[in-house]
Amino acid sequence: MVKIKELLAIVKSSVIVMVIVILIVGVIIPTVTSFIAENVDRGSANGSQINLDGKIYGSYLLAQAFNQSYFFQPRPSAINFNQTSSGAPECAPNTNASLNETSQNIKEFERMNPNVTLSQIPGVMIMDSDSGLDPNIPVQGAIIQEKRVVQSIINLGNIKGIRLSLHEVNSTVNQLINSSESQDFPIFGSYYVNVMYLDVGIINFLVNHNILSKSSLD
């Protein structure tokens, strides 16, 4: 039989090992990882927050509803971009309900972009994302919205009594698209842009040109 002293020694060793593992896995590794993340990529470590004039307006990782015509539109959302929730449509893809929903998404996209034909619209632009909060759209999905966005920015400037040149607005929007372009998988992946990045860039442009006031962001 195992003696009491031997049993206590085994228990003591087990406790020591457990404490060491807890310290390493639960304290040291998270602390070191957090320290590295904060110093290497502070923005991502904090959830890629959208910071405008010192205030947080969400995250670049979560799509929001930008209903004005001078903003790029994200993919449709079954949860109405409710950031306290997440989810896709409940209906199966081959049901009448799903077909009707897709048809409505097409009509809405064509209403917002009357110069775009159905064949130009990437399929994902008329399909709800799995989370309902996907901020990424294909590059083509941004390009076909570009004409509407540019003209709407110019029109908004005219309403505010500020004349913007087509060249300046075009260049700004093009630069936003190009600087946001990423590939979801090296070499063979598809190219996409982050709608939140584009629309925050537009907000900054409008604020800098005194077309939108900072107070209107609240």
Tell where the protein language model's regions lie, with residue ranges.
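Extracytoplasmic/periplasmic C-terminal soluble domains
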Residues: R148-D218
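Flexible, solvent-exposed loop/hinge segments and secondary-structure transition points
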Residues: G26, T33-Q145, V149-S152, L156-I162, ...
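Active-site oxyanion-binding pockets that recognize sulfate/phosphate
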Residues: V17-M18, A88, A92, F188
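Solvent-exposed aromatic/hydrophobic patches embedded in short alpha-helical segments
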Residues: L23, V27-I28, G141, Y197-L198
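N-terminal leader/signal peptides at the extreme start of proteins
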Residues: M1-V2
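Internal alpha-helical transmembrane segments
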Residues: K5-G43
